[in-house]
Regions:
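Helix-to-loop junction immediately C-terminal to a conserved catalytic motif
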Residues: 55
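Q-loop/switch helix immediately C-terminal to the Walker
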Residues: 92, 99-111
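Conserved ABC ATPase signature
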Residues: 137-141, 145
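Conserved catalytic motifs of ABC-family nucleotide-binding domains
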Residues: 158
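Catalytic Walker B motif of ABC-type/P-loop ATPase nucleotide-binding domains
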Residues: 162-165
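H-loop/switch region of ABC-family ATPase nucleotide-binding domains
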Residues: 198-199
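Conserved beta-strand-loop-alpha-helix hinge in the C-terminal portion
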Residues: 217-251
Length: 433
């Protein structure tokens, strides 16, 4: 624990650009070890981008966020990518909904950066320490319980520094103060260096040891002495006013021709198209590598595989395809017999041969085609929705903070689930026909 207390964060000559906009320029700062540092700034100033950068979610020199500079945790200089030295408590918690609270914490324990030492606490002990019930599913937990679970999972990964992303966003004053007390209690009990990123300075300043101000006008971060903390609201307002289109910029924009504005918009759209196309081509080129079944932990790959098997080949998928098969078989047989020429005379003579032909066509042609289309439509939509929820809820970013290649626990299990479930579903729809 003494190592965690002494671990400080030093940033030198940091430059950050996002979508062509300069967010930070030549920033150098020091976060003291074992303290709570609060970083305040206006909305859209780049606070969350900085947090994701420090957490290792944003690799160096890759679109859409480009950054350069030196990061040093204690005596160790870090280049880029997830490094296990920082843990992040996301604004939306980024908990794995398909796992129990105990499994969420155990996931972090099993993916610690340094597994040469035994974990400090078991998953159940972490839940008990943070006051999180283990029985209810994650979706049934209250907002406060989810936040405590997110903190427990972050601590279980044994990071040196804990990052908090807007922990009081959207909360009323009373709840915000309870969250601030929870952060302070966590820091005192576990003695981890903490960086809290927020625009709610009024709630979080009372727990701060140090305060940093992100000046969006000058694209820098400055330390605010304690005797100037009362001036933070005015300094934030001043920075926001200076950043909101100076008069000279408005004059220049108003005198520009329609062709100039349209040309810039077209160039930006074309650049975005080329960027998206390049990213898609890179993803296609990397598919054989990303789909190679190498996973950090076979146990957890199996858990994710089981989750996607439930989406692709679960009871609802089976019922859906069986009903579709019954409908297809019934309609094919009915309309074939219904519209036979001279049905009264030919049906008794051709019934056996006709049914055999219908069965052959269904099993050899229609069933595989129909099953493939239905599986692609229903199961593909289910998987896409699940991955979309993981992206929106921050779960994919949470995987990155644990140093996990996202294809290992997403792409590989999804492909495996389709390979296992598709033949079973096609057999079921054929059986229904």
């Amino acid at each position: 624990m003494s190592e965690a207390v002494s671990t400080a964060l030093t940033i030198a000559h940091l430059n950050v650009r996002a979508a062509g906009t300069e967010l930070l320029r030549d920033v150098s700062l020091h976060l003291p070890g074992g303290k709570i540092t609060v970083l305040v700034g206006g909305s859209g100033a780049g606070k969350s981008v900085l947090l994701r950068l420090l957490a290792g979610i944003l690799p160096r020199g890759q679109s859409p966020v480009y950054w350069e500079g030196d990061l040093r945790f204690g005596d160790a200089a870090l280049e880029s990518g997830s490094h296990g030295r920082t843990g992040i408590v996301f604004q939306q918690f980024a908990l794995f909904d398909e796992l129990t609270p105990t499994a969420n914490v155990q996931f972090a324990i099993d993916h610690r950066a340094d597994r040469s030492q035994p974990p400090r606490y078991s998953s159940s002990e972490w839940l008990e320490l943070l006051g999180v019930p283990s029985a209810p599913p994650v979706a049934a937990l209250s907002g406060g319980q989810k936040q405590r679970l997110a903190i427990a999972r972050t601590l279980a990964a044994d990071p040196d520094i804990i990052l908090y992303d807007e922990p009081t966003s959207g909360l009323d004053a009373a709840t915000g103060h309870r969250v601030a007390e929870l952060i302070q209690e966590t820091q005192r009990r576990f003695e981890r260096t903490s960086l809290v990123v927020t625009h709610d300075y009024a709630t979080l300043l009372p727990i701060a040891d140090e305060v940093l101000l992100l000046d969006s006008h000058n694209t820098t971060i400055v330390s605010v002495p304690r005797d100037q903390w009362s001036e933070i609201p005015e300094r934030l307002k001043a920075a926001a006013m200076h950043s909101a289109s100076p008069a000279s910029d408005r004059t220049t924009a108003s005198t520009r021709s329609w062709w100039g504005v349209t040309g810039d918009a077209t160039a930006n759209a074309f650049g975005n198209f080329l960027g998206a196309t390049g990213a898609a081509l890179q993803a296609i080129a990397r598919l054989p590598i990303d789909a190679f079944p190498i996973v950090p932990r076979l146990r957890w790959a199996g858990r994710f595989l089981w989750h996607f098997l439930g989406l692709i080949g679960g009871p609802t998928a089976c019922i859906y395809l069986v009903v579709a098969g019954v409908i297809a078989g019934f309609t094919t047989t009915y309309f074939t017999l219904r519209f036979l020429p001279f049905r009264l005379y030919t049906q008794p003579l051709l019934i056996d041969e006709l049914l055999a032909a219908i069965g052959f066509a269904l099993y050899r042609i229609l069933v595989p085609i129909l099953a493939t289309v239905l599986i692609a439509a229903r199961c593909g939509a289910a998987v896409a929705a699940d991955v979309g929820v993981k992206q929106y809820g921050g779960q994919i970013d949470a995987l990155k903070t644990f140093g996990i290649r996202t294809p290992a626990y997403l792409l590989v299990p999804i492909l495996g689930a389709f390979l296992i479930a598709t033949p079973i579903l096609e057999w079921l729809i054929g059986l229904a026909d």
